[in-house]
Amino acid sequence: VRFSLRPLFARCALAVALPVAAALALAAGTGSVHAQQMPPGAKQPSDFPHTKLTAGMYVINAAVAANDADREQGLMYRTHLAPNEGMLFVFGENAVHCFWMKNTLIPLSIAFMRADGTITDIDEMQAETTDNHCPRNNGVYALEMSQNWFTQKGITPGMQIGGLPQPQ
């Protein structure tokens, strides 16, 4: 009787390779689903104008959404934000501006501000929901940051955000 380890090794390799290949295929498929959701003509993060803002001792690198198309896209389809990175929404009118999280893949915090940069409201928003997030007060700016950013940095209503561009 001849005994060989070759069939045993082949079965073990197959038992390991199949689950690994399935996991990789699933991960690749998940990533491509999000990539496919970005509509043609949507701006990449680097395509937005950027500005530096201050919140207390923190410097924020903010993409600026100052027109209807940019405000509509906002942070949709983004899979992460760098530390101290966010998006500033600039409105031409002093009003209640509501937000939702449709096609927004990461949870965010939002601060609503008056024309002088004073924060009136801060809210936490869950990814991919259509719940309305509206401030209690009129304003001309909103700043979206990673979830809990304002809380973690000790930024509260009544404080001011500096470096804001003038509303148009």
Residue ranges and their predicted role:
Residues 3, 22-24, 67:
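Exposed boundary/loop context
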Residues 30-35:
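Sec/Tat signal peptide C-region and signal peptidase I cleavage site
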Residues 1-9:
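N-terminal secretory signal peptides that target proteins for export/translocation
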Residues 36-168:
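Compact, glycine-rich, soluble single-domain proteins
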Residues 11-29:
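Bacterial N-terminal signal peptides
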